[in-house]
């Protein structure tokens, strides 16, 4: 939270007059933050449980194609294609989890392999069926679909219409508000942050997650179903990646085989900046949410200040390194005090 406040203050000073903190600008950086936050929260839950998922980014590309190809080339209703994509996500997540639990292999290795498998399969299948790496034409299928609106409809439009009528926010030349509503990614992000925080803080399953990541053997000895907990968390990261993919595919109106590249690293970085330990057993969903908010704000802040956007990656790496050093320092001090 402190880091997020400092970032807001900094860009309030250097970019306050650029439109970054107008209604439209705020929605822009909230949208970027929310998209990252959706997968960062799931990555944080898995990290608290003591594991990593490096296949999140590839799952985003794979899920997008699982929506686009059936809908465009096989004639499926869009809602059926979305359900198919989520079904495949559950299958991939379960496969990752069962491999880690049953073989004892490090999740780093298992999911790194899945990263290549999913990305390669996405490229090969898409080229085989379509002859290219992008699948356009989804936008016309969104209207009247009973499921797509959950991922593709801005909310609270009436609020922005009213604000525009009162001249409280920027308007287009035709008199309509520049900011038309809250993006679906923001709603999903807030909902996931609230639900996962409640799970971690208030439920037995949340206690199991902390126990599984903190001391797997000890948790097993007291009856915690560590294997099932870890498998469910891998399913969670795959499903979160599919939520991300569905929102992006329906917003862009097309699927791209390379979508989601390196997003797994950004998600892990946001979770670490939010306080998750790389060793497991400690962290929070709300911390990961603030980590994503920091990265989203910096990403758009760099754009608004006309700084070369390549510097965002430098910031990403520096923030993660500082967070890891700080987290290890705090952990060492806590251990010494005991």
Regions found by a protein language model. Give the residues of each.
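Cytosolic-side transmembrane-helix boundaries in multi-pass membrane proteins
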Residues: 1-9, 221-228, 298-338
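Helix-loop-helix "hairpin" substructures at the membrane interface of multi-pass membrane proteins
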Residues: 77, 81-82, 91-96, 100, ...
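Loop-to-transmembrane alpha-helix initiation sites
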Residues: 107-109, 135-136, 181-189, 230, ...
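Single transmembrane alpha-helix segments in multi-pass membrane proteins
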Residues: 7-14, 22-74, 78, 98-105, ...
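Hydrophobic alpha-helical segments embedded in the membrane of multi-pass proteins
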Residues: 32-42, 62, 94, 116, ...
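Alpha-helical transmembrane segments within multi-pass membrane transporters and channels
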Residues: 75-116, 290-291, 295
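Transmembrane alpha-helical segments in multi-pass inner-membrane proteins
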Residues: 234-235, 241, 251-317
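Transmembrane helix-bundle core of multi-pass membrane transporters
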Residues: 111, 115-203, 232, 255-257, ...
